[in-house]
Structures are given as structure tokens and as C-alpha cells.
């Protein structure tokens, strides 16, 4: 019970950093790719890790009260396609189940870039990551700086930042 309460407290603190941004279908619906991911626990997002998600497509349902994400994960060099549907809650966070329970929200958005923060909780503990999805292959210098800043705000070491485009052989 104490572990559960600590996880709930940690989730509340991690989500208090930023106001959750609303998104609309016109901003989201379409093909996306994962550009960068940075995590406090690199093991889950390393090559072959269950949270190293190579986005393919995102789509809003019910005015973005649901967010469907289609992505690939490479396990044993084989691409596996997964679909999750995040349900939006009053606080603006989405929740879904994949490799544990996930609580995610939009940190920042432009026409072709969306920064997400995700907290993943499973039987082995809690980990958090920032993921950048885009409609192009890289971030500009200011956006890379923004990713570093966001990682620092969530106490995620910047040296854990990984550029996923070079390793994304699933979406070619």
C-alpha cells in the first residue's frame, strides 16, 4: 500500500511540472514518427526495449478524448506493430496499458512536432520519459534545447537522449 501511495504521489508531482496542452484532431490525425526519446531508465527505451516506440500514426477520437497511437517496437530485430488508445482524464492526462500502465500528456506542440511526457508503471517500478514525435526527421537547434530543458525539469539525465530516426527500420 505504501508503494502504491508513493507512486501516486510521484505521478502527481511529475504532472504538476507543466500545464497539459489540449490537442485537436486537425493537429494530430496523420502519420508521425518518433524523433527522440529520453528516459530516466534507459533499459526500457534502448534498442530492443519494450518502450522504444517507433510511431507510425496518431488519430484522435471523440474530439481527442481518445488518442490512438499506432507504433512499432523492434524485438529481436523484428518489427511488431502495436495499437494503444489513450483515454483522456479531467486533468488532461491520457492513460493506456502497454508494458504496464502509462500516463502521458502533451508538453509542447507545433504544426509538425509534439513533445510528450510519459510515466510508465509496471511490476518492476516507475519510469518516466519524454518522447518527441514529428512529421519530419529531426529537430532544429531550439527544439533540441527545449528537449534538454524538459528532461532536466523531470530529472531525466540528458545523456540518456536517443535519436530514434537512424534506428527506425520498421517505417521504411
From Swiss-Prot:
Gene3D superfamilies: 2.40.128.20. InterPro entries: Calycin, Lipocalin, Lipocalin_CS, Lipocln_cytosolic_FA-bd_dom, OBP-like. It comes from the Eukaryota. GO terms for molecular function: odorant binding; small molecule binding. Its main location: secreted. It holds the Pfam family Lipocalin. CDD domains: lipocalin_OBP-like. It is found in: Secreted. Residues 1-15 form the signal peptide. This protein is found in nasal epithelium and it binds a wide variety of chemical odorants. This is Odorant-binding protein. It comes from Rattus norvegicus.
Amino acid at each position: 500500500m505504501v508503494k502504491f501511495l508513493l507512486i501516486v504521489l510521484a505521478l502527481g508531482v511529475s504532472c504538476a511540472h507543466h500545464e497539459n496542452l489540449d490537442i485537436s484532431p486537425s493537429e494530430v490525425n496523420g502519420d508521425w514518427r518518433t524523433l527522440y526519446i529520453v528516459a530516466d531508465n534507459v533499459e526500457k527505451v534502448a534498442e530492443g526495449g519494450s518502450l522504444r516506440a517507433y510511431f507510425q500514426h496518431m488519430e484522435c477520437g471523440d474530439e481527442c478524448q481518445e488518442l490512438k497511437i499506432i507504433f512499432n517496437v523492434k524485438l529481436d530485430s523484428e518489427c511488431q506493430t502495436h495499437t494503444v488508445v489513450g483515454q483522456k482524464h479531467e486533468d488532461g492526462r491520457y492513460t493506456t496499458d502497454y508494458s504496464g500502465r502509462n500516463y502521458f500528456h502533451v508538453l509542447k506542440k507545433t504544426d509538425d512536432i509534439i513533445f510528450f511526457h510519459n510515466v510508465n508503471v509496471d511490476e518492476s517500478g516507475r519510469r518516466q520519459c519524454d518522447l518527441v514525435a514529428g512529421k519530419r526527421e529531426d529537430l532544429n537547434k531550439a527544439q533540441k534545447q527545449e528537449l534538454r530543458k524538459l528532461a532536466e525539469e523531470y530529472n531525466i539525465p540528458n545523456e540518456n537522449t536517443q535519436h530514434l530516426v537512424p534506428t527506425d527500420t520498421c517505417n521504411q
